[in-house]
Amino acid sequence: MNHELPVISLFSGAGGLDCAIESCAEPPLVQDGSGSPLRVAVATDYEQTALDTLSANFPHTKTLCGDIQTIPTAELLEAGGLKPGDPTLVIGGPPCTPFSKSGFWIEEKRNSADPNASLLDEYVRVVRESKPEAFILENVQGLTYKTHQAQFDRLIAGLKDAGYNPTFRVLLAAEYGVPQLRRRVFVVGRRDGKAFHFPETTHSGESERDRVIDHTKIPFTSLREALAGLPDVPEAGEVVEGTYAELAAEVPPGQNYLWHTDRYGGRNEFKWRSRYWTFLLKADPDRPSTTLQAQPGPWVGPFHWENVKNANGEERARRFRVAEMKRIMTFPDEFVFTGVKREVQRQIGNPVPVELGKVVVRALMEQLGYLDSRGTTIPSQAGHEQLELI
């Protein structure tokens, strides 16, 4: 083994958490090329397009495409040039549809009967058999809901049985400087039995649940701040057309379809609370974005707060462009996405925001003794191969 600390990445997608892994030595919210002592040795996903994106950005990472249920842990280790006990971390976010709001209306998903829910067991299997020093699992907060308690309890029990001490917490990305009101649950565990301590929040502002602002912290990062400096380059398919095109264009920034009810100033087209909150939702430039979705419907926001003209000169709402979505998800501007727009939207909308992942990875690496509080690699920990299994 070389001095780089190897990581196994499961359900990698386009590499959001992988990007956090390979930049964790950078200060929070800074992309200065400081790098990381960690390197993703091998990554898996069932979508080749997502792995093409990952390979375009991390050419040193070996990739395996396929259903994780058919990939033995030994094959993962071999692809990464590893043996049990070698990986510093196992990371990943199993497909979240069974636990997300977007899939909640399907009864089998409410009850965690969706086949994808069993992928949590596959994550536990790889952790148990590869014996990393620690692991990070992330998912939508819906995984912690009472409707999924049996599945979540099974996950925690499995990780404990594998010899780890898992702790979990739902984190709001905006509270760590990400320009998005996106909540993700993180489950983190160490093989040495010590508990992981989650990093303190650094930012404060109004969210969909909290109107109390802590003025001792940094204000939330607004969309206007996050998207500043991007060139105004139109993209194909960005104009919102169809049945509700005119209504979407008339919605003010920060409002949604409720603008067109009898309680607000628009047309009286909809009944109060008859649609999803994201229906015809227009972003507020002075606040963080609401959650970007991986597979939004044609009239599902958030849309950009500024309208554009269509080919006929009519005013229309527009969707966020790829460069803008990368900023909202805190991917580096130079990060390359492969595939058609629909595939890119899914790749950007699925992962944890990079900077949210980075603060968790950085905290774990500090607590394991690989980084100091400034993000500097501690030389005495370079001999990772000397660590013994517990």
Curated annotation (Swiss-Prot):
Q: Ranges for the SAM-dependent MTase C5-type domain?
A: 5-371
Chemical reaction(s) catalysed: a 2'-deoxycytidine in DNA + S-adenosyl-L-methionine = a 5-methyl-2'-deoxycytidine in DNA + S-adenosyl-L-homocysteine + H(+)
InterPro entries noted in UniProt: C5-Methyltransferase (IPR050390), C5_MeTfrase (IPR001525), SAM-dependent_MTases_sf (IPR029063)
What are the cysteine partners in each disulfide bond?
none
Q: Which GO terms describe its biological process?
A: DNA restriction-modification system; methylation; negative regulation of gene expression via chromosomal CpG island methylation
The record, for SUPFAM superfamilies, names: S-adenosyl-L-methionine-dependent methyltransferases (SSF53335)
State its Enzyme Commission number(s). Answer: 2.1.1.37
Q: Give the main EC class.
A: transferase
Gene Ontology MF annotations = DNA (cytosine-5-)-methyltransferase activity; DNA binding
Instruction: List keywords of the entry alphabetically.
Output: DNA-binding, Methyltransferase, Restriction system, S-adenosyl-L-methionine, Transferase
* Coiled-coil region(s): none
Pfam family of the protein (one): DNA_methylase
Q: Which residues form the active site?
A: 96
Report the PANTHER family cross-referenced here: CYTOSINE-SPECIFIC METHYLTRANSFERASE (PTHR10629), DNA (CYTOSINE-5)-METHYLTRANSFERASE 1 (PTHR10629:SF52)
Family classification = Belongs to the class I-like SAM-binding methyltransferase superfamily. C5-methyltransferase family.
Query: What is the protein name for this chain?
Result: Type II methyltransferase M.SacI
GN (gene name): sacIM
